[in-house]
């Protein structure tokens, strides 16, 4: 069962002449990896303010961290969620990743000892994008972590990270309604499986359409499966394997009135053209990472194979390899 003891590590910073506490809190347990998180990692270093209410609820303000902070697998310490070669393919909500330079305001309400609801409002300091998400989390099932969320994303001048203007029309913003689910299962002390799935429906809002007559709603999805194993070759090593299909448009089309020719009296004759936004192929990322730390010597080997990059209709395979070494003083 999950051990409900909380571990909190704090670092004092002086900001604007007052003291704030930078803290990252996670659930440690006997089933999932309870090794200490490296708080000096840039992915974790941030300013976080916490306030606990009398009814075991909590208010958090998290600045300059991933928009996925305290959502999904970020709530537990699990070594399988450690993809390193392709940052866009991590086991996190892909839609929230479109919020740049986020500030996360969250409210946690415990329904029971092992159940809670999270409500997050995520604002961007880069543009006018923002998101709202509510998540249900259950850790009462033995060796399992389950979360399910629904949310809303408003992107400024973009839809799923893409923007355009000029003759094609001027995109004002887009609205995306999404669902997201996470499952972690600990088979035994040294083996764990993580599964992440997301689904969304997006609508583009234009200031003016230009050549575009109609821009349909876009249906998109994402999934990733990760497997982690300790002691593959030695007692103090960790290895991870993952299969990811990155975010993909499953359906959507654009209807355009394309100029074909002009008549003698300068009348523009247009021809309607329908563009299918859904690619025929699926991009698949296969990744393997091996890490061993012995006597303060840290070795890491990573291999990433990208099949049909960007969901290209032309079959292709790209391979990336990474080898790193660090010594901890």
PLM features: residue spans?
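Outer membrane beta-barrel transmembrane domains
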Residues: 92-99, 106-108, 126, 146-173, ...
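C-terminal alpha-helix/helix-terminus motif
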Residues: 11, 327-329
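Beta-barrel outer-membrane channel/assembly domains of diderm bacteria
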Residues: 42, 315-327
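Outer membrane beta-barrel translocator domains of Type V secretion systems
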Residues: 3-187, 198
């Amino acid at each position: 069962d999950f051990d409900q003891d909380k571990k909190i590590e704090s670092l004092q910073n002086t900001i604007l002449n007052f003291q704030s506490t930078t803290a990252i809190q996670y659930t440690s347990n006997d089933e999932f990896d309870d090794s200490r998180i490296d708080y000096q990692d840039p992915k974790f270093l941030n300013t976080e303010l916490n306030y606990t209410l009398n009814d075991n609820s909590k208010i958090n303000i998290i600045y300059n961290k991933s928009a996925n902070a305290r959502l999904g697998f970020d709530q537990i310490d699990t070594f399988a969620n450690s993809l390193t070669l392709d940052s866009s393919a991590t086991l996190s909500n892909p839609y929230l990743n479109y919020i740049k330079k986020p500030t996360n305001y969250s409210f946690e309400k415990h329904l029971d000892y092992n159940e809670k609801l999270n409500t997050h409002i995520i604002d961007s300091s880069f543009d006018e994008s923002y998101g709202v998400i509510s998540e249900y989390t259950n850790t009462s099932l033995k060796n399992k972590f389950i979360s399910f969320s629904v949310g809303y994303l408003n992107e400024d001048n973009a839809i799923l990270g893409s923007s355009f203007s000029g003759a094609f029309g001027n995109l004002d913003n887009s609205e995306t309604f999404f669902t997201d689910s996470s499952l972690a299962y600990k088979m035994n002390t040294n083996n764990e499986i993580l599964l992440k799935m997301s689904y969304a429906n997006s609508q583009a809002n234009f200031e003016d359409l230009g050549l575009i007559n109609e821009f349909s709603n876009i249906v998109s999805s994402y999934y990733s499966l990760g497997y982690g194993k300790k002691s593959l070759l030695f007692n103090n090593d960790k290895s991870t394997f993952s299969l990811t299909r990155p975010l993909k448009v499953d359906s959507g089309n654009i209807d355009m009135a394309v100029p074909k020719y002009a008549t003698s009296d300068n009348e523009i004759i247009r021809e309607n053209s329908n563009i299918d936004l859904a690619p025929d192929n699926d991009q698949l990322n296969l990744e393997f990472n091996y890490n061993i730390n012995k006597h303060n010597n840290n070795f890491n080997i990573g291999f990433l194979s990208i099949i049909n990059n960007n969901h290209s209709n032309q079959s292709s395979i790209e391979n990336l390899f990474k080898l790193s070494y660090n010594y901890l003083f």
